[in-house]
């Protein structure tokens, strides 16, 4: 199990990403707009840099919903490989079974 503080940190990052998503997207649109003036683009860059670091989506880490494990995460299930295997062996994931050939 991951530490509770790490889970809380990820939850805080998720809130920040949601809060600043529109503002961040608008600033990036201005920066990539070739028709905008250099001054507007530069101001957008400075404003983007002044936003909280954790408001960037790339700072988030996918974690297992049950254990909080950061590695071996499977997006399709939202779980780590270990928990997916346990659930599969119990038959809790429909249509998923152990491979044999």
Swiss-Prot record:
GO terms for molecular function: rRNA binding; structural constituent of ribosome. InterPro entries: Ribosomal_uS14, Ribosomal_uS14_bac/plastid, Ribosomal_uS14_CS. GO terms for biological process: translation. GO terms for cellular component: cytoplasm; small ribosomal subunit. Belongs to the universal ribosomal protein uS14 family. Part of the 30S ribosomal subunit. Contacts proteins S3 and S10. Binds 16S rRNA, required for the assembly of 30S particles and may also be responsible for determining the conformation of the 16S rRNA at the A site. This is Small ribosomal subunit protein uS14. It comes from Vibrio parahaemolyticus serotype O3:K6 (strain RIMD 2210633). The gene is rpsN.
């Amino acid at each position: 199990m991951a530490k509770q503080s790490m889970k809380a940190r990820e939850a805080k990052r998720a809130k920040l990403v949601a809060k600043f998503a529109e503002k961040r997207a608008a600033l990036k649109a201005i920066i990539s707009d070739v028709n905008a003036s250099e001054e507007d683009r530069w101001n957008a860059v400075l404003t983007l840099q002044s936003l909280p670091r954790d408001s960037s989506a790339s700072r988030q880490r996918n974690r297992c919903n049950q254990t909080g494990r950061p590695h071996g995460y499977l997006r399709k299930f939202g779980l780590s490989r270990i928990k997916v295997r346990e659930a599969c062996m119990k038959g809790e994931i429909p249509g998923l079974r152990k491979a044999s050939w």
